[in-house]
Amino acid sequence: MRPCDKIIIQTIELTRKMLDLADEGEAVQEDRNCGVLYGVVRDSAYRIKQLAEAEKEAHIRKGWWKE
């Protein structure tokens, strides 16, 4: 697998961790600002995941992606 493809996979894995962190944070939040923070983490994770998956698809279409 190409190094850039490994980074894309790691990025997608990171977004899963970010979503888990947002879930955990929301479960224990003590004030509204924490909720805002975890909402930003969640939104960012979804956006990063979307970009990483689009890049993965581009690599697949170009024939670069080897698993």
PLM regions and their residue ranges:
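Short, charged, low-complexity loops and linkers
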Residues: 1-6
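Short, charge-rich amphipathic interface segments used for partner binding and complex assembly
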Residues: 7-17, 21-65
